[in-house]
């Protein structure tokens, strides 16, 4: 294992409980694509998590999605907020990361969250994609702790409407 990988391994050591607790808490928040209030609550959690990074964070309102109802009338469907975090945009190398924080599940009971085999969490949005967000943030956190991190810039997009086809 090279020095960078050892440094990343040290950064990740002991973080499993923190990551699982974060995932469980986030899966306990409804962030159904059409639940604008739930998306707002989830976006606030994400903004809180991004505070630990040396990144500039921008929150953008998306335009309403225009749909047609059963009577043929146009209706505006509000969407959640897009979150964009940028770290070291002047660095010689850049990485773009993107993931969504909405879920396909409408509001649900917290009882649907359960730990399987003491290690696997089964929960609405756990794999798609709140678990991916947790892993991505942990990886970024570990990366930020190694020598040479200043040579790489990154930009992270957190999308609130992927399950709808990203109309915003």
Regions found by a protein language model. Give the residues of each.
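Acidic/His- and Gly-rich active-site-bordering loop/insert found
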Residues: 2-124, 145
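Acidic/histidine-rich catalytic neighborhood of metal-dependent amide-processing enzymes
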Residues: 121-123, 127-168
